[in-house]
């Protein structure tokens, strides 16, 4: 009887951590499409617009990406 309980306890202790811990596929970093759907980018957030504009201007014309050209005066916005 005790050996059966020991075997059952050993099996439970070995199997439980394998299922209780998150697997690698469950991490948000492994699912970029889902992560990007929930992400609020700085392009859509007016609170971050000033900081992004400052970063564009610090880099001069070299740092002018598409967003900077559309939103920053130093990159050609009128």
Swiss-Prot record:
Domains (record comment): The cysteine framework is III (CC-C-C-CC).
Organism: Conus bullatus
Entry annotated with the keyword Secreted: yes
Propeptide: 23-51
Subcellular location: Secreted
Recorded superkingdom: Eukaryota
Lineage: Eukaryota, Metazoa, Spiralia, Lophotrochozoa, Mollusca
Cysteine amide modification, residue list: 75
Outcome following mutation: residue 55 to A: No change in blocking SCN3A (K(d) is 118 nM)
GO molecular function: ion channel inhibitor activity; sodium channel regulator activity; toxin activity
GO cellular component: extracellular region
Tissue distribution of the protein: Expressed by the venom duct.
Family listed: Belongs to the conotoxin M superfamily.
Keyword check for Protein transport: no
Annotated spans, Disordered: 26-46
InterPro entries (UniProt xref): Conotoxin
Signal peptide (residue range): 1-22
Note: Negative results: does not or very weakly inhibits rNav1.7 and rNav1.8.
The protein's role, per its UniProt record: Mu-conotoxins block voltage-gated sodium channels (Nav). This synthetic toxin potently blocks rNav1.4/SCN4A (Kd=0.34-3.6 nM), rNav1.2/SCN2A (Kd=13 nM), rNav1.3/SCN3A (Kd=200 nM), rNav1.1/SCN1A (Kd=360 nM), mNav1.6/SCN8A (IC(50)=1.8 uM), rNav1.5/SCN5A (IC(50)=9 uM), rNav1.6/SCN8A (IC(50)>30 uM). It is noteworthy that the toxin is 50-fold more potent on mouse Nav1.6 than on rat Nav1.6. The block of SCN4A is very slowly reversible.
Keywords: Amidation, Cleavage on pair of basic residues, Disulfide bond, Ion channel impairing toxin, Neurotoxin, Secreted, Signal, Toxin, Voltage-gated sodium channel impairing toxin
Name of the protein in its database record: Mu-conotoxin BuIIIB
